[in-house]
Amino acid sequence: MASPREENVYMAKLAEQAERYEEMVEFMEKVVAAADGAEELTVEERNLLSVAYKNVIGARRASWRIISSIEQKEESRGNEDHVASIKEYRSKIESELTSICNGILKLLDSKLIGSAATGDSKVFYLKMKGDYHRYLAEFKTGAERKEAAENTLSAYKAAQDIANAELAPTHPIRLGLALNFSVFYYEILNSPDRACNLAKQAFDEAIAELDTLGEESYKDSTLIMQLLRDNLTLWTSDMQDDGTDEIKEATPKPDDNE
């Protein structure tokens, strides 16, 4: 008979298939609670947790961007009544974003980072911590934005130190970290030069060791390398003309083997 932990993993997969991501988060939170403080999640479990939260936050991030864009248009037209309604609605989405980010950040700080024993799991969770502080920095303002940006930077830097020491340049988690860290420099810190340097270095180091890639991670690694290159192309053209194409980020997959 399956243990409660195995049952919750199965239910999380079921919720994912049904695209019921809020429930997927709940099942995976039960898995984290069931794992003893000193016991790591399996690679499959941590990927399921990441996918669940990424989808729940992703829907709200998309909503926030759409509403913010409409707000700008209405402001430029001088429709003050509409702007007031939009601001109120945006604030509701921001409350949801804050709650979701705080939920996973609490889990990371209280359990997941402390129980991580391997280099790849430490980098995985620290990258995740950086990602969710970055999502807060996307919409927070003033002192709250500054704090979120500082927390993002320290989490990504801690992850980068471990990744550089313990993971190959072609490792999908190391590449995914470089991708998201460079997006942070570009979007949050408005440092296109730093963003491009970080992305280019990660890409070049991976290219130099491409022949050492195992078959199981080849697809994941080359996909992220392509995203790094896409962003580099976009950013270098943006520095010449103010483009607004979509910036690529690392997206977790439930079947990652790394």
Swiss-Prot record:
Pfam families: 14-3-3 (PF00244). GO terms for biological process: protein localization; signal transduction. Residues 245-258 have a biased composition (Basic and acidic residues). GO terms for cellular component: cytoplasm. Residues 238-258 are annotated as: Disordered. It comes from the Eukaryota. Gene3D superfamilies: 14-3-3 domain. Transmembrane segments: none annotated. Coiled coil: none annotated. Homodimer. Belongs to the 14-3-3 family. This is 14-3-3 protein 6. It comes from Solanum lycopersicum (Tomato). The lineage of its organism: Eukaryota, Viridiplantae, Streptophyta, Embryophyta, Tracheophyta.
